[in-house]
Amino acid sequence: MASGEGFVVWFTGLSGSGKSTLAAMLAAELPRRGVHVESLDGDVVRTHLSKGLGFSREDRDTNIRRIGFVARLVARSGACAITAAISPYREIRDEQRRAIGRFCEVYCECPLDVLERRDIKGLYARARAGEIKGFTGVDDPYEPPRSPEVIVHTDRESPREGLARILAKLEELGYVRPMAQPAEPARAGLAPPHGGELVDRFVRGDARQRLLERVAGLPRVRLDERGASDLELIGNGAYSPLKGFMTSRDYLRVVRERRLESGLVWSIPITLAVPGEDAARLSLGSEVALASPDGRVVGVLELVDRWTPDKEVEARNVYGATDEGHPGVAYLRSSGDVYLGGEVWLIERPLSPQFPEYPRDPAATRAAFEARGWRRVVGFQTRNPIHRAHEHITKCALEITDGLLLHPLVGATKAGDIPADVRMRCYELLLEKYYPADRVVLGLYPAAMRYAGPREAIFHALVRKNYGCSHFIVGRDHAGVGRFYGTYDAQRAFDDFLPSELGIEPLKFEEAFWSTVVGGMATDKTAPGGPETRITLSGTQVRELLRAGKLPPPEFSRPEVAQILLSATQGRGHDQAA
């Protein structure tokens, strides 16, 4: 802190204008500048400090005075208090400014029509319909600040642009020092898990026996394959910091802002969907037995939330589509219409482990990296065989890291994707012949594909952070399907977040190909020549060759890998290849 004195950053603006997002980003950045931060989110304050207050003018003012009082105490202690509350009335905001002194007001300005289009919670629509009275911006006034320190136009500025201007103002005010760029010290160990702690929800020993005795009398929900995969990945810590299926508060914020309620970056909703008639027989506050697809009771849900989501909004925000030609949208619409939320405990793995000789838990991969002395580990996610282009980018990444986690997805995929057993034979052969054995760990990621493109790319990176990776490869159309996403949309998604928020560095690669000009693998950045000098094939072209009993050219795929695919295609009658 520039002077050692505390200060308050007060975010104000209409509901949905981006206050909480910017507040969370600022809270993640200031500790890097030596500033201790305490956050006061308006929604959280109303459920605790201001519980019981309504929305009259008097109650609103009381709520803001309470927030201001706590913020002032935080600032007096030498820390920064970040508040994010609508705080609609100018007079009460100015009262807090006078009382606090070192005060930076940030107005998140956004036109009302934009906010109503963004309205994932449906609050504006309910207010327009008269279901919510005294709703700020509809039938209760919002008084914009006259002279805020910063105005962020959240309808046309990215969160990163807004954050940069807030930080610049804090530097100008002398509240924080300009960011120095010292050489980063060598890490003493692997990157910490997302949220700081590797979750473990498996029960063992006597606790497991007691849980087994209890589940017999519990109502039961049977999981599908995706739900079973999600349960295992919650249990083994791959989805850290999640300890269960999301509640509505986390879900809504993830769908709207790609963040958990805590402000932590998280881009994919992890939910448990059930039919309405099943949900109706379950009581909040009770336990629910979770059964695997084959009927085994494998865990327990502590049910604390139940709600009916707006699946059209979820489809648009998460998948960028509402067309059922998108497999993620099709799955969403076919799943149960009620979501259940709460923490889980696992008795056993929900799915029978495939390929048990390979690590599938974050604790196991982290132990493998530690045993090898690795600190900088790059993760590579794949649901396809590794052809020459993939080999090229993974080896480029190995040049700047200690080791590679080759991490194929072995959960549910769409029709037409290559079966896991065929892909595993390809990986094993390729690693044996073409990679240094001491630089690669082959692990398993037992998740279902969602085909959510840019959002899933962020999600895959955060999960690999939990597995111990410091870097993550993002190629062309990561986690894409069909023509739903642009070629490099997934790479651009990482630009929406600060590196300190993600805690894992994306390695962005352009499409690789065999160049006849340079006689090797290259990209647009490294090889001259037009399309006629490049050897690359689409998935459709590869499938046509394999159906005809022909191998793809060696410039595209290692002959040994191509032979495995040819044998599998001919033997199974599949038209599957990639």
UniProtKB/Swiss-Prot annotation:
InterPro entries registered for this protein in UniProt: APS_kinase, ATP-Sase_PUA-like_dom, P-loop_NTPase, PUA-like_sf, Rossmann-like_a/b/a_fold, SO4_adenylyltransferase_pro, Sulf_AdTrans/APS_kinase, Sulfurylase_cat_dom
SUPFAM superfamilies registered for this protein in UniProt: Nucleotidylyl transferase (SSF52374), P-loop containing nucleoside triphosphate hydrolases (SSF52540), PUA domain-like (SSF88697)
Chain positions covered by the region annotation Adenylsulfate kinase: 1-192
GO cellular component, as recorded: cytoplasm
Region (Sulfate adenylyltransferase): 193-578
One Pfam family from the record: APS_kinase
Catalytic activity, EC: 2.7.1.25, 2.7.7.4
One GO term of the biological process aspect: hydrogen sulfide biosynthetic process
Protein's UniProt keywords contain Transferase: yes
Highest taxon above the source species: Bacteria
Active-site residue numbers: S87 (phosphoserine intermediate)
GO molecular function: adenylylsulfate kinase activity; ATP binding; sulfate adenylyltransferase (ATP) activity
Gene3D superfamilies: HUPs, P-loop containing nucleotide triphosphate hydrolases, Sulfate adenylyltransferase
Residues engaged in binding ATP: G13, L14, S15, G16, S17, G18, K19, S20
Keywords carried by this UniProt record: ATP-binding, Kinase, Multifunctional enzyme, Nucleotide-binding, Nucleotidyltransferase, Phosphoprotein, Transferase
Catalysed conversion reaction: sulfate + ATP + H(+) = adenosine 5'-phosphosulfate + diphosphate; adenosine 5'-phosphosulfate + ATP = 3'-phosphoadenylyl sulfate + ADP + H(+)
Biochemical pathway: Sulfur metabolism; hydrogen sulfide biosynthesis; sulfite from sulfate: step 1/3; Sulfur metabolism; hydrogen sulfide biosynthesis; sulfite from sulfate: step 2/3
Membership in a protein family: In the N-terminal section; belongs to the APS kinase family. In the C-terminal section; belongs to the sulfate adenylyltransferase family.
Name listed for the protein in its UniProt record: Probable bifunctional SAT/APS kinase 1
The encoding gene: sat1/cysC1
